[in-house]
C-alpha cells in the first residue's frame, strides 16, 4: 500500500469512528479480550470498515447504516485471530490454499510456515512455489527458509541439498521472514561451519532465526545453542523448558497439535510462577 492509499484508508476509518460514514460490519455486545491491557471488557461493540477495525468501545450504534451488517455477539468472547507461530503445511498433505481454507473458519488469521518438507523434495524451487502461493492468500502467510535440507544427512535420499548460498538467495525474496527452525542443534553447539554460515546469512539480511532444541539438557549445550542465534523454540515440553528459554532471551512457543500437547505443562510458567506472558507464543 502506498502513502496515498494508506492516507485514504485511514481517513475512511476516522469517518466511521466519528459516525460520518457507515461501517461495513458491526459486532455488538461481546466480551472483548483486550490483549493490550490484559482485561476482559464486557458490553463491547466493534465496527469494521473494509479489512480494518475503525472502532472498539461500548456503543457502535453511530456507525450503523442501512447497509451495515450487524452481528449480535450476545456476550460471546471477542478475541484476536490466532497467529500460528510455527507449522508445516505439507504435514497436512495440503497446499497452502487448501490449508488456509481449512483453518480460517477456526480463527487463524496468520501463519508462520517452514516448508522444509517440500524443500527436501524440490529444493529451492519448491520453497519459491510455497512463497508465491502464500503471497496470494486472504490471510498473512509468512515463510521461513528451511535451514536443514536434508534433515537427516546420510539417513535419507533427498531430492535436494540446500546450504548458505541458497539461504542467501531466499533472504532476498519478498515473503521470506527468516531462517526456519534450526533442527541441527548439535551442529550449532559443535560449531558446524555450514550451519553457522546459514545463520550468518539470515542475520546479515536482518531476518529472524527459528529454533528447535529437541533435548532435555539445559546445561552448556542449551546455552551454546542460544548463543548461536536461534530466537524462539517450540521443542519445550516441561515447565523448566519454558522458564529456561525465557530467561535466556528466547520466545518459548507453547505447542498444541495432534502429536504434541505441551501447553498445559509450560503455561504454568505464567499461571503459577507469574512470568511475563508477552514473550510466549502459541503454535
Protein language model regions, located:
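Short, ordered loop/turn segments at secondary-structure junctions
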Residues: 58-59, 115-118, 146-148, 184, ...
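Divalent-metal coordination cores built from histidine and acidic residues
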Residues: 2-17, 21-22, 97-208
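Di-metal (Zn2+ and/or Mg2+/Mn2+) metal-binding site signature of metallo-dependent hydrolases
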Residues: 76-99
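Active-site neighborhood of phospho(di)ester-bond hydrolases with catalytic His/Asp-centered motifs
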Residues: 79-85, 113-116, 144, 180-182, ...
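Divalent metal-coordination and catalytic microenvironments
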Residues: 30, 46, 51, 75, ...
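Histidine/acidic residue-rich metal-binding segments in metalloenzymes
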Residues: 126, 161-181, 187-254, 260-282
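Histidine-rich, glycine-flanked metal-binding segment
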Residues: 2-80
Amino acid at each position: 500500500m502506498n502513502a496515498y492509499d494508506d492516507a485514504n484508508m485511514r481517513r475512511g476509518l476516522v469517518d466511521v469512528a466519528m459516525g460520518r460514514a457507515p461501517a461495513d460490519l458491526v459486532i455488538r455486545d461481546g466480551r472483548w479480550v483486550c490483549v493490550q491491557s490484559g482485561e476482559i471488557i464486557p458490553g463491547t461493540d466493534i465496527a469494521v470498515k473494509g479489512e480494518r477495525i475503525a472502532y472498539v468501545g461500548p456503543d457502535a450504534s453511530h456507525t450503523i447504516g442501512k447497509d451495515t451488517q450487524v452481528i449480535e455477539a450476545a456476550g460471546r468472547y471477542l478475541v484476536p485471530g490466532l497467529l500460528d507461530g510455527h507449522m508445516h503445511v505439507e504435514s497436512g498433505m495440503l497446499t497452502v490454499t487448501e490449508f488456509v481454507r481449512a483453518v480460517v473458519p477456526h480463527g487463524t488469521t496468520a501463519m508462520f510456515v517452514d516448508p522444509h518438507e517440500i524443500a527436501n523434495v524440490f529444493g529451492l524451487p519448491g520453497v519459491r512455489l510455497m512463497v508465491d502461493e502464500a503471497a496470494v492468500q486472504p490471510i498473512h502467510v509468512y515463510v521461513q527458509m528451511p535451514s536443514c535440507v536434508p534433515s537427516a544427512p546420510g539417513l535419507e535420499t533427498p531430492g535436494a541439498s540446500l546450504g548458505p548460498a541458497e539461504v542467501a538467495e531466499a533472504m532476498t525474496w519478498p515473503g521470506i521472514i527468516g531462517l526456519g527452525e534450526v533442527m541441527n542443534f548439535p551442529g550449532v553447539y559443535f560449531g558446524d561451519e555450514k550451519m553457522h554460515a546459514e545463520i550468518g546469512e539470515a542475520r546479515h539480511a536482518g531476518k529472524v532465526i527459528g529454533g528447535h532444541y529437541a533435548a532435555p539438557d539445559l546445561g552448556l549445550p542449551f546455552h551454546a545453542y542460544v548463543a548461536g542465534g536461534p530466537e524462539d523454540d517450540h521443542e519445550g515440553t516441561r515447565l523448566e523448558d519454558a522458564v529456561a528459554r525465557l530467561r535466556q532471551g528466547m520466545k518459548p512457543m507453547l505447542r498444541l497439535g495432534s502429536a504434541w500437547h505441551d501447553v498445559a505443562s509450560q503455561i504454568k510458567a505464567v499461571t503459577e510462577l507469574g512470568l511475563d506472558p508477552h514473550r510466549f507464543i502459541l503454535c
